Regions:
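Basic nucleic-acid-binding interfaces
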Residues: 1-137
Length: 137
């Protein structure tokens, strides 16, 4: 079993991990290996600017998965949109010839995203633990 890493701020101890999925506009298959490699570099750097840490990242031709550790001060919707904006702008600039074959407008990501908290005990275990608080024996 993997030991859970705890982080601290002035008034709290926490362990927050998130799974984020970003999908290309119209699910077009535009993410080649070189684009994926560069995307992961951009996303890692952007996460670090938000005081987050990329644990794992990978993807396929039409989407990327990011597993990252965050902190309690994160506004997840703002972070997700910043990740999409920064990476879209840089990828479209650096891979203009390749991207323009698929997208004629300045787009790359779908406007939606998927994010889920993960790690720690299953919900059923936490629920049982809370239910049992205050009971003796």
């Amino acid at each position: 079993m993997e030991k859970q890493e705890l982080s601290t701020l002035n008034h709290c101890v926490f362990s927050l991990q998130y799974h984020l999925v970003l999908v290309t506009k119209y699910r077009k298959q535009v993410i080649s290996e070189p684009i994926l490699k560069r995307l992961l570099e951009i996303l890692r750097e952007t996460l670090e600017k938000w005081d987050c840490r990329l644990i794992e990242g990978n993807g396929e031709a039409d989407h990327v998965h990011l597993l990252f550790a965050g902190n309690p001060n994160l506004q997840l919707s703002v972070l997700a949109n910043n990740l999409k904006t920064v990476s879209s702008r840089l990828i479209r600039k650096e891979f203009k010839k390749e991207i323009s074959k698929t997208y004629w407008k300045p787009v790359f990501w779908h406007r939606s995203y998927f994010i889920m908290s993960c790690g720690g005990a299953p919900l059923s275990v936490i629920k049982k633990y809370i239910e049992d608080q205050g009971s003796k024996g």
